[in-house]
Amino acid sequence: MPQSAEHVLDHVELFRGPEYQQMLAKKKIFENPRDPAEVERIKEWTKTAEYREKNFAREALAVNPAKACQPLGAVFASVGFERTLPFVHGSQGCVAYYRSHLSRHFKEPSSCVSSSMTEDAAVFGGLNNMTDGLANSYKMYKPKMIAVSTTCMAEVIGDDLNAFIKTSKEKGSVPADFDVPFAHTPAFVGSHVTGYDNALKGILEHFWDGKAGTAPKLERKPNGAINIIGGFDGYTVGNLREIKRILELMGIQHTVLADNSEVFDTPTDGEFRMYDGGTTLKDAANAIHAKATISMQQWCTEKTLSFAAEHGQDVLSFNYPVGLSATDDFIVALSRISGKEIPEQLARERGRLVDAIADSSAHVHGKKFAIYGDPDLCYGLAAFLLELGAEPTHVLSTNGNKAWQEKMQALLASSPFGQGCQVYPGRDLWHMRSLLFTEPVDFLIGNTYGKYLERDTATPLIRIGFPIFDRHHHHRSPIWGYQGGLNVLVKILDKIFDEIDNKTNILGKTDYSFDIIR
């Protein structure tokens, strides 16, 4: 063998050894072999316009959808509250997926439990699982709140969360006055952004509307505070901290709902923090009195904002404010709603972003980009690219709907750089592959899964989105606000300059442009 206890090889090198190469060659012959020439022919055919037409005609199949399921979003929202334990009514395997997905992106532990439903619960219902699960969770993990959501299994058989939680309390699983908000989050409809919305609405409904009949409904007494909702966001650590900094600079009384910026960025100091930070339960209840609720992501919070509006609040939503104009709109709205002046420090930060754009616009201007991801992220990035004079040629969102498509088209139509750009709601990354082959662009913007498109189509990938598994700590830096816009600009420019270097580094042939100044 090529390694020993004294010489352990990384997997990158290990499988290149002669023993593994021989094994893999035999495996290829044994497992459904195909003529290499035929494989090559089909591969080339999948790059054609003819194949693209067939690809876009499919209806009953998704290949590499750029979305996740509802319970992931529910877990993400739930951990944003003080000492809250997400409890997913379903199987252990599903919950392992949510935990690993969040842990691999944020490089932090992700605490979540399940009711461990198996075959018997799928037939007879999961009441016993709920009863035992709530009791064990309450005793073992000492939460202040347990937020319940569901998986496909529980939804298909029709388990009633409200009834199950009441019965569990009657059986003594948790105290009668213990907070157990819930939301039905069927994974076979919607996506993780839907689950975020459902879970957040469920938690606010619990506190504002009488805790499932166990307490009086709260009576709203309006004050001057503003509620902020970040939405499902892979940059929640950096972005929420940036938004809170802006609010504090402006002197605005505020509550960030579902504030998970601390639990996904805990320090290593000898103390394990299963729960850290989060919106306090008292603040979650008092949020009913706020003057307004502002969502940073429209498509993440449609139900929650409607719920806040029903309780008499002014509501306002943005679409992932990246760049100059989007941040202007956000800060002006804060000033208008709160009556506070915009501080000089923010004006200076704006000027620095304008200066950076002016310094680098020649390198970005006219470049073609393809973008995929969640609806609000795609909108925010496309808007910023238009500001930079770039062309968001393909904008694809698997969980985007018709309303999102219309809003995106209006954005593209508002700029000369958006002419000829196309929007693709409900499409997946196999559709994007056809687009990149038949209508090539200069750069691709998306999450880690875009690296396969980068390999197949040779389109350089700029990693922005969720999840980012193969790069570390991107989530710690904001991409909202003026500072966030500068961070995104740097990401784009770094990739542009890397590509220039890659294309000019052959000694004596292309290195006449291998410059140290760009």
Swiss-Prot record:
EC category name: oxidoreductase
Residues noted as binding [8Fe-7S] cluster in the record, renumbered to the chain: C69, C94, C152
Gene3D superfamilies given in the database record: Nitrogenase molybdenum iron protein domain, Nitrogenase Molybdenum-iron Protein, subunit B, domain 4
GO cellular component, one term: molybdenum-iron nitrogenase complex
Catalysed reaction equations from the record: N2 + 8 reduced [2Fe-2S]-[ferredoxin] + 16 ATP + 16 H2O = H2 + 8 oxidized [2Fe-2S]-[ferredoxin] + 2 NH4(+) + 16 ADP + 16 phosphate + 6 H(+)
Cofactor(s) listed in the protein's UniProt record: [8Fe-7S] cluster
GO molecular function per UniProt: ATP binding; iron-sulfur cluster binding; metal ion binding; nitrogenase activity
Note on how the cofactor is bound: Binds 1 [8Fe-7S] cluster per heterodimer.
Further remark: Ala-187 is present instead of the usual Ser that would serve as a ligand for the 8Fe-7S cluster in the oxidized state.
Quaternary context: Tetramer of two alpha and two beta chains. Forms complex with the iron protein (nitrogenase component 2).
Function, as annotated: This molybdenum-iron protein is part of the nitrogenase complex that catalyzes the key enzymatic reactions in nitrogen fixation.
Assigned protein family: Belongs to the NifD/NifK/NifE/NifN family.
Protein name: Nitrogenase molybdenum-iron protein beta chain
Organism: Bradyrhizobium diazoefficiens (strain JCM 10833 / BCRC 13528 / IAM 13628 / NBRC 14792 / USDA 110)
Recorded name of the encoding gene: nifK
